[in-house]
Amino acid sequence: MDEKLLQFFHSLDRSLFIDNRYKTLAHLDRPLPIGHGQTISQPSLVVYMTAHLQLDKTTRVLEIGTGSGYQTAFLAEFSQEVYTVELRGDLGAKARQRLDALGYGNIRYKLGDGSLGWAEHAPYERILVTAAPKRMPEDLIGQLAPEGIMILPLGPPGYQQLLMVTKDKQGEVTQTKLLDVAFVELVGKYT
């Protein structure tokens, strides 16, 4: 694992992204509720997914599900620009306040159905989906750049597979299973 990623992980206070009633649990490696049936992912999984995206400062990333903004901070730290889409306005607004307070100026925010992506700014070199669709979101595949990587959980509630989806120069798409996971369900066209 990249040393800079681990250093950032240890320097970022997860409690900044959690409501007061759960702050004492922020140090635990487990998901925690953030409202509306959504969760902040466990820290080890955030680091794992970020590492598999293979980010650098020239990368443009589409994030589906801003949530608390915790994962967004990792993306913003290691990429050129982040486009993040959140369905729930109050979650998106809180995340934006947190990320603005941390000084991130390379994030663009959108309120809407994340399963549709953000076509106006496509293609993206990397896409991260932080909630699980039941079927592959074709709109997101279409917005993935050639030689791009998408990480997403896929499957029914309670049991999904974390996949790495790659697209080659010719547009051929390949899926690789990374882990068995349990994410909240993605709400939108692909649910």
What residue spans do the PLM features occupy?
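Conserved nucleotide-cofactor-binding alpha/beta core module
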Residues: 54-170, 174
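Class I SAM-dependent transferase core
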Residues: 1-62, 66, 70-78, 91-107, ...
